[in-house]
Swiss-Prot record:
Source organism: Methylococcus capsulatus (strain ATCC 33009 / NCIMB 11132 / Bath)
InterPro entries xref list: NADH_DH_suC (IPR010218), NADH_DH_suCD (IPR023062), NADH_Q_OxRdtase_suD (IPR001135), NADH_quin_OxRdtase_su_C/D-like (IPR037232), NADH_UbQ_OxRdtase_30kDa_su (IPR001268), NADH_UbQ_OxRdtase_49kDa_CS (IPR014029), NADH_UbQ_OxRdtase_CS (IPR020396), NDH1_su_D/H (IPR022885)
The protein's assembly and partners: NDH-1 is composed of 13 different subunits. Subunits NuoB, CD, E, F, and G constitute the peripheral sector of the complex.
A single BP term in Gene Ontology: respiratory electron transport chain
Stated name of the protein: NADH-quinone oxidoreductase subunit C/D
Amino acid sequence: MAAPTTEHAETIVPALCRRFGGETFVQQTTADGISTLWLPARILVETIRYLRSEIDRPYALLFDLTAVDERVRKHRDGMPASAYTVVYHLVSLERNADVRLKIALPETDPALPSIVAVCPAANWYEREVWDMFGIRFDGHPNLRRLIMPPTWQGHPLRKDHPARATEMEPFSLPDDVQQQEQEALRFVPEEWGMQRQSEDTDFLFLNLGPNHPSVHGVFRVALQLDGEEIVDAVPDIGYHHRGAEKMGERQSWHSYIPYTDRIDYLGGSMNNLPYVMAVEKLAGIEVPERARVIRVMISEFYRIASHLLFYGTFAQDVGQMSPIFYMFIDRERVFEIIESFTGARMHSSFFRIGGVAMDLPEGWDRLIREFIAYFPRRLAEYDKAVMANKLIQRRTRGIGAYTTTEAIDWSVTGAGLRATGLPWDYRKARPYSGYENFEFDVPTGTNGDCYDRCAVRVEEMRQSLRIIEQCVEHMPSGPYKAEHPLTTPPPKERTMHDIETLIQHFLSVSWGPVIPPGEVCVTIEATKGLNGYYLTSDGGTMSYRTRIRTPSFPHLQMIPLMSRGMMVADLIAILASIDFVMADVDR
């Protein structure tokens, strides 16, 4: 994978030192090459403001904000003493560069100033860190639980919080406790600074979800309505939370791969990619060219499958019933191809540390060539049925629109960002897995509205088909898995060669590989935007900290901005155009 440019190391670090004093920062070396700086909490807000708005080509995109419980970490060479570390990851799209800021906090009453005033996207991220780690953000407009239920005791991503049900008391839900839990979910407008009435009218408060079909999962949006007009909206997430990051601390590096399939569960093995690439970077594994191309081909098939589902449900939510049935037929053809060489449809867990699970079978290209000939005609038909439909255009053009600046302020990536006219695609900007060897275009929109978000994804399917065709025509020969001691599972044919290889195979399969200590963040252009895994290894067989940065999480945070002043029917189109699944949000 191409690393971020070194320009930020040459310019932004000295600039920060000049602005705040060289003795203020402590630099840390990480496996991903991103400039990582420790700084005191007292200059946090000013540093974020400086990076986001006071320099040329600013680091305006808050890619991630998370934390690490450092209390039982063994390998912290050269890092400041810290019980909890809060991590800020910012990206400059103009520089194509990243910077990572870290702040050390004590074990007792860990607290930081909130940066929401200078970076609106930090709102949910700070709430998540408070929810999961118990780190307080002073000055946050409404610091309350985000993922866990309001009545939850403790902070799950602390190391002293139980990781398994067997470590906790048996679960029971008496009637009185159930009533308390239900009451805790009641929406109280005053808690969100909302008025129940104005001079002219009494406002209506409506729960859209968590069981409404148009919210695409277990998800609630509490609406403040003046008649049919939306005055304000409060997205309520967490109903689909399964503790994916916590589980990463209790699974071996290899056995965690199936869990990644089920984050954006419509993206299938594409979810494996940033995770296995991150482990490979920590382990120093060079993946063979054939394996890289197989990964690209499978990822693009999953992109098409995911976009077909989006396309059909988008049309359905806006009022068309027929397209989704035809698109599901095409989606099944894609799954038939995927199943022919992975053995599974949606959750194949096909990627491995060091390569892929198996080589392509004999005659693997036949179904693909048939699909390449078939699919463009179907897309042309869908253009006539959906994109050219006057009802679709009236319902989606000018609805839920935002600018490029607003998208970056709210950490929007993927098709939602490109719909504003910015041609920023991670596969082009920072090619990984050999994407630099493929010819494809980056579709963009102009208005940043619901219609453009759909149009960008439709064109992306055509570009994915181009990439797949190049994979078929130029599939390299060679091994499908790296010859490396930490490749997992190791090549089976070596197990009976001698006792050393047999022992290595046994240990790798049972305990799992021992990955060297370090930190790394690897990001890909997933189906819904930028998907990244920030892994911390403490030199063991399991991850010390597994951070999953998903695109859908910040995208839902932007719903109030897009929906204020719109009608309830417009909100349905807005939700459909975002393209999210709740497992990708809640993790």
